């Protein structure tokens, strides 16, 4: 059985995803959805002796808490897969086509308002083509349309919460 505990900011999309999986044939007793704060729900789940593995996406401090909780358990070692938002980098050499680089940068850095764990965070461009690439990226970024993500013309939707907004402002 998989117990899915989404981030507190995403209960609606998690519900839709689980409903779609159930509609596609995944049995309800094989996939269950639990909502609530990670500090209580997540901690209680990790502490259960029946837990055979944990997959976590979130902050490094919380991943470390989960790791310590699992290590303190009696019995067999419980595997932990933790994705904690590493730095997704792109290295561009002098043979790259600036148009392709600009498109890839904009797609990776700005889709999903840059909130995916795989969003581009670090761009290293060979000095021979850097000026042209930067100019193209700036031009492409200026063309992005911010707005309601339900509208097809929108390229850049809202961020998930006030904390994410504050992080962008820094």
Q: What is the predicted role of each segment?
A:
Residues 8, 37, 57-60, 129:
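Flexible, active-site-proximal loop/turn residues at the rims of small-molecule/cofactor binding pockets
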Residues 1-28, 85, 99:
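Conserved small-residue-rich beta-alpha loop and adjacent elements
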Residues 4, 33-35, 56-58, 80-83:
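General beta-strand structural signal in soluble alpha/beta enzymes
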Residues 32-55:
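A structured beta-alpha segment of the ubiquitous adenosine-cofactor-binding alpha/beta core
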Residues 5-6, 30, 55, 157-160:
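A generic structural signal for short
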Residues 23-25, 47-48, 53, 60-170:
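ALDH superfamily catalytic-core signature
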Residues 10-13, 38, 164:
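Conserved donor sugar-nucleotide recognition element shared by glycan-biosynthetic enzymes
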